[in-house]
UniProtKB/Swiss-Prot annotation:
Main subcellular location of this protein, as a coarse class: other
Binding site for Zn(2+) 1: 287, 290, 322, 325
Protein name: WD repeat and FYVE domain-containing protein 2
Oligomer and partners: Homodimer. Interacts (via WD repeats 1-3) with AKT1, AKT2, PRKCZ and PRKCI. Interacts with VAMP2. Forms a complex with VAMP2 and PRKCZ. Interacts with FOXO1. Forms a complex with AKT1 and FOXO1.
Coiled coil: none
Positions contributing to Zn(2+) 2 binding: 314, 317, 344, 347
Subcellular localization: Endosome; Early endosome; Cytoplasm
ZnF (FYVE-type) residues: 281-352
PROSITE patterns for this protein: WD_REPEATS_1, WD_REPEATS_2, WD_REPEATS_REGION, ZF_FYVE
Signal peptide: none
GO MF, any single term: zinc ion binding
InterPro entries per UniProt: G-protein_beta_WD-40_rep, WD40/YVTN_repeat-like_dom_sf, WD40_repeat_CS, WD40_repeat_dom_sf, WD40_rpt, WDFY1/WDFY2, Znf_FYVE, Znf_FYVE-rel
Function summary: Acts in an adapter protein-like fashion to mediate the interaction between the kinase PRKCZ and its substrate VAMP2 and increases the PRKCZ-dependent phosphorylation of VAMP2. Positively regulates adipocyte differentiation, by facilitating the phosphorylation and thus inactivation of the anti-adipogenetic transcription factor FOXO1 by the kinase AKT1. Plays a role in endosomal control of AKT2 signaling; required for insulin-stimulated AKT2 phosphorylation and glucose uptake and insulin-stimulated phosphorylation of AKT2 substrates. Participates in transferrin receptor endocytosis.
Length: 400
């Protein structure tokens, strides 16, 4: 008798469309060319490549250009086809790409920094080129003349850069874990405020100008959502990676955040839910549930003739508790904890199954990601990894 084969339930996951190989070193940055089946990449091997899809279905370089120094970052403007490339020697080189993307014409070079350029943004509306470098300098230049308009010294090397055109606010994330907000004028800037919420360095920034929300990723494995538009100082933490968060991208039309990490994980977060701030951790000399003293509370230990215990914290209420009163674990997705974390026994009983429902999906890119670019129109995601490979994914099964 033949056994009936039950079809497997369909799991929604990204579809790998293409792999692009050939770089001798890591591809530090790459972008999907809008309205074209093409990709522009810059690599540590000093090459700039424009990959176009051939009749065979494979992507091959139509432009292969060697730079005088390793390429650390880039910014591409599709309307003007202007390509700004940051180099390891501190130079920014600008090119114009031909309409068919088969030719790259040099426009100008300028010495923007004393050492490696870490981030570049080209702002078409103001004709500015914003950049940060390992010299701890943020600078902005006129893209027409190449003239330096102004600068600001950051507290540490910057690794994240975003700009809001409407308010002329620039957001700079650095290795100290700080996010600095500056207001830019034509030739000067003023410090607006600084945010500090990460225990590690900021590795990526993403700005949503519609909701006026800033996302920051960090080497502490977390993402923080800073609600600037709400004007209440709300900061929501998202915990979904096992390694440093390397890149962030936001899909405005579906209100989903894509975070990618050194663990190879692609996490898609539903930001269209009412999320809650994580509570401040409370300090206490004894367990706030059973009143047992903690190990540094010698007086209570002596008076009660009890051995001091180690202090823990409930992730839901923030109370200081002992191990016995916090023996349970639970995920709390609305607080950003997609993995199970320590909670006190009373909070564990109070958390409902609905509150445990996941608000993120997890996918494996099978390479340690260093950079991503999301094309919202087609729903394509580009990932670049430490394996020197560029991968192109169709994200429509999970970003919709």
């Amino acid at each position: 008798m033949a056994a009936e084969i039950q079809p497997k339930p369909l799991t929604r996951k990204p579809i790998l469309l293409q792999r692009m190989e050939g770089s001798q070193e890591v591809v530090n940055m790459a972008v999907i060319v809008p309205k074209e089946e093409g990709v522009i990449s810059v690599s540590e091997d000093r090459t700039v490549r424009v990959w176009l899809k051939r009749d065979s279905g494979q992507y091959w370089p139509s432009v292969y250009h060697a730079m005088p120094s390793p390429c650390s970052c880039m910014s591409f403007n599709p309307e003007t086809r202007r390509l700004s490339i940051g180099l390891d020697n501190g130079t920014i080189s600008e090119f114009i790409l031909s309409e068919d993307y088969n030719k790259m014409t040099p426009v100008k070079n300028y010495q923007a920094h004393q050492s490696r350029v870490t981030m570049i943004l080209f702002v078409l509306e103001l004709e500015w080129v914003l950049s940060t470098g390992q010299d701890k300098q943020f600078a902005w230049h006129c893209s027409e003349s190449g003239q330096r308009l102004g600068g600001y010294r950051t507290s540490a090397v910057a690794s994240g850069l975003q700009f809001d055109v409407e308010t002329r606010h620039v957001f700079i994330g650095d290795h100290s874990g700080q996010v600095t907000i500056l207001k830019l004028e034509q030739e000067n800037c003023t410090l607006v405020t600084t945010f500090r919420g990460h225990t590690g360095g900021v590795t990526a920034l993403c700005w949503d100008p519609v909701q006026r929300v800033l996302f920051s990723g960090s080497s502490d494995h977390s993402v923080i959502m800073w609600d600037i538009g709400g004007r209440k100082g709300t900061a929501i933490e998202l915990q979904g990676h096992n390694d440093r968060v390397q890149a962030l991208s936001y899909a405005q039309h579906t209100r989903q955040l894509i975070s990618c990490g050194g663990d190879g994980g692609i996490v898609v977060w539903n930001m269209d839910v009412e999320r809650q701030e994580t509570p401040e951790w409370l300090d206490s000399d004894s367990c706030q549930k059973c009143d047992q003293p903690f190990f540094w509370n010698f007086k209570q230990m002596w008076d009660s003739k009890k051995i001091g215990l180690r202090q823990h914290h409930c992730r839901k209420c923030g109370k200081a508790v002992c191990g016995k009163c916090s023996s349970k674990r639970s995920s709390i997705p609305l607080m950003g904890f997609e993995f199970e974390v320590r909670v006190c026994d009373s909070c564990h009983e109070a958390i409902t199954d609905e509150e445990r429902a996941p608000t993120a999906t997890f996918h494996d890119s099978k390479h340690n990601i260093v950079h991503v670019h999301f094309d919202a129109t087609r729903g394509w995601l580009l990932t670049s990894g430490t394996d020197k490979v560029i991968k192109l994914w169709d994200m429509t099964p999970v970003v919709s």
